[in-house]
Design a protein with these regions (language model features):
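Short polar/acidic secondary-structure junctions
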Residues: 6, 38-40, 51-52, 87-89, ...
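Conserved beta-propeller blade repeats
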Residues: 1, 12, 16-37, 42-46, ...
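Structural motif
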Residues: 1-2, 41-48, 91-96, 135-141, ...
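Predominantly five- to eight-bladed beta-propeller fold
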Residues: 54-58, 185
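Short hairpin/turn module used for nucleic-acid contact or packing/dimerization
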Residues: 138-139, 143, 163-166
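Non-catalytic extracellular/periplasmic "stalk"
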Residues: 141, 146-156
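Short loop/turn segments that connect beta-strands within beta-propeller blades
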Residues: 5-9, 50-54, 99-103, 143-147
Length: 185
């Protein structure tokens, strides 16, 4: 993994991935990197690297026994928490946070179906999540300052994916999967 300068395209190697791990996520401040190792179709490990440390260390942040799946969902906008999904606590995948300051873990979203994704607006005011509910993705957009869900109006029937906010958070873009039409933005 290299860090490139946008000014002159010079590069600095941050980490040599000799283990053949899959890139999971990079924090918005560029300090944290998560890699995944698929041990089988039912067992995954996640590894964290602090690229600002004087000595880079690949830390397994999901030590476990048995078949447990973990997947990277990204970081909070302030780069202080890593978000991941796991089926460690039941049949369905839940979204959890890992505090990068303290190492504390906390459930973020747990439903009666799999949590498919979690994302944030640039400032962190809004959180979007998708839950797979009987082969349909139920999307929730929450204003974290009020705790209220935002109702999306005039959205065609289908599954919303890859929800993105513009910089001032006044609009969103998303992809839409429908069984009667191809994927549309």
């Amino acid at each position: 993994m290299y860090r490139y300068s946008a000014a002159d395209y010079s590069r600095t190697m941050l980490y040599e991935n000799s283990e053949g791990l899959d890139l999971g996520a990079i924090s918005s401040d560029g300090r944290w990197v998560v890699y995944a190792r698929n041990n089988s179709n039912a067992d995954t490990d996640l590894f964290l690297i602090d690229v600002a440390a004087s000595e880079l260390e690949l830390v397994n942040i999901t030590p476990h026994e048995g078949n447990i799946e973990y997947a990277s969902m990204g970081f909070t906008p302030d780069s202080r928490q890593f978000i991941y999904s796991t089926n460690e606590f039941g049949e369905f995948s839940q979204a959890w946070t890992l505090s990068l300051d303290t190492g504390a873990r906390q459930v973020l979203i747990a439903e009666d179906w799999d949590v498919m994704y979690v994302g944030y607006s640039p400032s962190g005011r809004y959180r979007v999540s998708g839950i797979n509910n009987v082969a349909r993705t139920v999307v929730t957009l929450k204003d974290l300052t009020t705790g209220r869900d935002i109702v999306l109006k005039n959205v065609p029937e289908g599954d919303l994916a890859q929800v993105r906010f513009n910089r001032d958070e006044s609009a969103i873009a998303f992809g839409l999967y429908r069984d009667t039409a191809p994927y549309d933005v």
